[in-house]
Amino acid sequence: MSRGNSLLRVAGMATMPSRATTAPRAIESILPQVSRLWLFLDRFDAVPEYAEHERIEVLRSQDHGDLRANGKFLSLALDVGPCTFFGVDDDVLYPADYCRTLESHLGRWSGATAVGVHGGLLRAPVTSYARDLKVLHRRAPRQHPTEVDLLGSDSVAFRTSTLRFDVRDWPDVNMVDLSFALSARRRSVPLVTVPRKAYWLSALDENQSDSIWAGVLRDDSRQTALAQELVALPRPPLPRRRSRWPRLFVRAP
């Protein structure tokens, strides 16, 4: 949670009934680190027991529409005040120093970037999103910060004073990483992956048949169009760094 005069930490997650095994563990790992978790329940008949907590604010698709995974960011358009916002997923286990570490990196960029763990670089010209995306996977180690075209919304942080948007204006659902990247680039906000050890974040489950990436592999035509739109926009310059990187990481020469 927040300390002293620092910004509140707020997280957003979207989940669906098929994640009933992993979502409670993901929530358990992130909840102690934030003041509030906005939890978007996609097509639930009832609020599950694991969502009943004083620091969890439930948003239901029956009340807010068919936003699917986009719902993790819905609170930005509601009553979230100034904060550091963390996008998290229902199938990722977050380490105890997760929020503190990402906040530290935001501070080193003066809060003018969005930072994250899972990222991607697009090779231009983009002819296929699935083929032309180089993934910097969250489980892989990185020795130095890297500016990227996309950040995975499962492991992203930013200050609401720098970036705020309304997912209800996004034309697509379940294309969160690309839609987030476009929102950031249109506002000239750079995206940066942070240094970390291997498996600093760990997956609670992978390769689910109903995952967003599985859908991309079946048909990436719409994602390709969005990726082409993204690379056509100039990548914003990185701001000047304020201080050295945390001792936990070794920066590459």
What positions do the PLM features span?
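Residues at the starts of beta-strands that form the adenosine-phosphate
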Residues: L8, S35-R36, T84, P190
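Short beta-strand-to-loop acidic/aromatic patch adjacent to the donor-nucleotide binding site
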Residues: P82-L93
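Conserved catalytic core of nucleotide-sugar-dependent glycosyltransferases
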Residues: L93-V167
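Active-site-proximal specificity loops/subdomain of glycosyltransferases
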Residues: D42-C83
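Short, charged/polar "capping" segments at the starts of alpha-helices
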Residues: R19-T22, F44-Y50, A124-P125
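Aromatic-glycine-rich donor-binding/catalytic loop that engages nucleotide-sugar donors
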Residues: C83, D149, V156-N174, S183-V189
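C-terminal catalytic/acceptor-binding lobe
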Residues: M1-L8, G12, D169-P253
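Short, well-formed alpha-helical segments that are part of the catalytic scaffolds
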Residues: M13-Q33, W38-L41
